[in-house]
């Protein structure tokens, strides 16, 4: 029986390789304040964005912390990502010999609404490159933050797209 790679059929190979390259670049430069700390992935509902990203992250040896539309993603929750100095590695890996990095996935980001007050603005502050003196004093994450959404022209998403890779 022949095997067929669905990613080849869907023409995702270039996207996958590009994403892996960006993740590698992030890991090599995460201590720098001038890098973008987030990625925005978008596509039609049900097209497999979340599954694709989760599979790539597992392949790259990441533990994944997911926040989706059913979670509260307001300002205080987003700031918790950095204020409590979230480790670069999972606590469980301390007991194992192989270290696993952490990646934060904000799924259905275009679904952040009034209940998530201040969430988008806090996320922007965490992921944007720190260029000015004021920005350099802001909190940031040593973990990559991947935002997944259905739309790339959405009003709420416009500002965050300016600060992250897509």
Spans of features found by a protein language model:
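Active-site catalytic pocket residues across diverse enzymes, especially alpha/beta-hydrolases
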Residues: 26, 60, 127-130
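Acidic, Ser/Thr-rich intrinsically disordered and amphipathic helical segments
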Residues: 14, 18-21, 51-55, 77-80, ...
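Pre-Walker A (Motif I) flank of P-loop NTPase domains
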Residues: 33-41, 100, 143
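Beta-strand elements of modular eukaryotic interaction domains
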Residues: 26, 30-31, 55-56, 92-96, ...
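A detector of helix-start/N-cap boundary segments at the beginnings of structured domains
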Residues: 4-9, 41, 65, 166
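Walker A/P-loop
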Residues: 36-67
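Non-catalytic interfacial helical region
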Residues: 68-166
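Pre-Walker A (pre-P-loop) alpha-helix and adjacent loop at the N terminus of AAA/AAA+ ATPase modules
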Residues: 2-37, 88-91
